[in-house]
Amino acid sequence: MSLKSKTVTIEGGRDNGKKFIIHEMPAAKVDEWAMRALMALAGAGVDVPEANEGMMGLAKVAFSALGNVPYEKARPLLNELIDCVEYVPSGGTPRPIDLNIGDIEDFTNIWKLRKEVFNLHIDFLQQGNSPN
């Protein structure tokens, strides 16, 4: 079975109509990312979900709770989420996002794409349950 991907089209604002492809990380990489995120959350004093809530509990708090993690620890985690996104220029070939040349003009869309990446990795947990 191949890794999942998803196309996201931005609606409205300065990035209206821009398309991005979200790619799933390989299992070992996402496991390592999740462990570092969990440790960063716990280290920042975030109340990590009870063991009986499992990954669904973590999914409920992880993305919003990253705001409690010191910048030095959160930034690499957030950057790794953006590394899963490719920009599809109009009529062009998908390529890694370059935030320095304006692939994304509205910073809120950077956060939207990060959340889309996170959700792609936990969608199997959402079968009948929602982390939001």
Locations of regions flagged by a protein language model:
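C-terminal charged interaction modules
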Residues: 75-132
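Short, charged/polar N-terminal "headpieces" of proteins
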Residues: 1-51, 121-132
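Generic secondary-structure boundary/loop-capping signal
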Residues: 22, 63, 96-98
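Short, compositionally biased low-complexity segments
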Residues: 5-11, 48-56, 83-94
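Non-transmembrane, amphipathic alpha-helical segments
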Residues: 22, 66, 102-105
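Structured domain cores in non-transmembrane regions
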Residues: 32-76
